[in-house]
Amino acid sequence: MIHPTAIISSKSKISKNVKIGPYCIIDENVSIDENTEIISNVHITGRTKIGKNNKFFPFSSIGNIPQDLKYSGEESKLIIGNNNVFREHTTINPGTSGGGMITKIDDNCLFMIGTHIAHDCNISSNVIMSNNATLAGHVTLKENVI
């Protein structure tokens, strides 16, 4: 189901059973896999690939350009695995040329309200980040980190 107020680029790839709520914006080069739910007022942009069964809560900003002053517009990526939950006001930036061009989140993670994952981070499976926790660029979190 896609809400009529959602703005979705014809160049994005949306799989079956994806729910996109009111006032969401899905830009070109975004790929969203099956059974993901994007509740409302979420912006997903950049070269962002989202796996299956993820849930994005309102006012999340996913894939916008890095907050790295060295970033000069290079085409970097954000890759998100399966079964993750992104609560309200989560922000995630793609990679930069100084860190391999990829920010990656594996599976079964919980990002509580106001979390920020900066450029070139690598988040393994089963990670929990509590309210307003932030990661600077180039941070790696191993499995089961809370």
Question: Which residues does each PLM region occupy?
Answer:
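Structural signal for interior beta-strand "rungs" in well-ordered beta-sheet cores
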Residues: I2-I146
